């Protein structure tokens, strides 16, 4: 069970890294509402990690530490070396698409890890622990659905920057 919790912990630390970097990226291209969404996800991941650590300690008497989180570096792009005001509209569209694709791929992989963890706990007859982990499965499933919907909505408007920025302004109020 310790290894299952450690795998979840490592993934959550990685999730905090990706949401931090997505927040930075969206702030860089002035997508304030998207940055706020990522910051909210960052806080939810942090809370989830603390709940996992508390659950493991109080219910299973084990201390879990993140010793091998995935290395996340989505900001390692040449385009980000330029000042924001030197980015073309196409550059910004590319960055938005890139960020959303990275987020979606991260959540897809997270969902597999969480579902496998749930399944392994059920197989071990650790039903209470599996039930605890099931909430993470549901959370990542919802986050994945939201990320995919955001991508589809923006794709449906053909990545029109004026519309995207207008909606950001309305959502940020």
Where are the regions a protein language model picked out?
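Iron-associated oxidoreductase/ferritin-like identity signal
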Residues: 1-173
């Amino acid at each position: 069970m310790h290894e299952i919790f450690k795998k979840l912990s490592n993934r959550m630390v990685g999730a905090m890294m990706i949401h931090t970097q997505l927040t930075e990226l969206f702030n860089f291209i002035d997508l304030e509402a998207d940055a706020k969404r990522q910051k909210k996800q960052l806080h939810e991941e942090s809370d989830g990690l603390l709940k996992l650590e508390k659950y493991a300690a109080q219910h299973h008497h084990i201390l879990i530490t993140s010793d091998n989180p995935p290395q996340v570096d989505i900001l390692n792009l040449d385009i980000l070396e330029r000042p924001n005001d030197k980015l073309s509209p196409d550059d910004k569209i590319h960055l938005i698409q890139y960020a959303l694709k990275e987020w979606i791929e991260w959540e897809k992989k997270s969902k597999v890890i969480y579902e496998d963890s749930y399944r392994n706990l059920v197989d071990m007859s650790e039903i209470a622990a599996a039930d605890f982990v099931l909430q993470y499965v549901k959370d990542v499933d919802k986050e994945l659905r939201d990320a995919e919907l955001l991508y589809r909505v923006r794709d449906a408007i053909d990545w029109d920057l004026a519309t995207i920025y207008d909606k950001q302004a309305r959502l940020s109020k």
